[in-house]
Amino acid sequence: MEQPRYDEAKWPILLVTMPPEELAGPDLLLHMDRMSAFSKRGVQFVQVIDVRAASSLSAKARRLVAERMDQDEEVYPHILVGVAIVLATPMHRGIFKAITWLSRNPRPFEAFSEIDEAVIWARGLLRAQHSLTLPIAPDVTKRVG
């Protein structure tokens, strides 16, 4: 069975291309472990997941993915900044919505039809997140106060 491809060339944007066959059982668990490993690094990042050629996930698989994302958020808070999904069909959009509804932790989720659009969104999200977490320089606070 073909496995997902993980492309870190644009890190901290992670591009994941899902295979045509549905991931299930040990293959799905391996994929989720690999995705969790990116959070373990402790560096904020955005996932861009290309599912245009992928088959749909079962309801059980959708629940497992959402649960793992929630677990990762609890252990590594605010590391996964957002998720962009590149979709080709309305069926994929429905699966994507189901995963976002199943997740307990709010994070930006956005659907796109092209990878380039998703990467632009991911860059903007990281830029905005970075500007929110930058410390205020001491000389600026002196001038304001």
Regions found by a protein language model. Name each.
Residues 1-145:
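Amphipathic, Lys/Arg-enriched alpha-helical "gate/interface" segment within cytosolic domains
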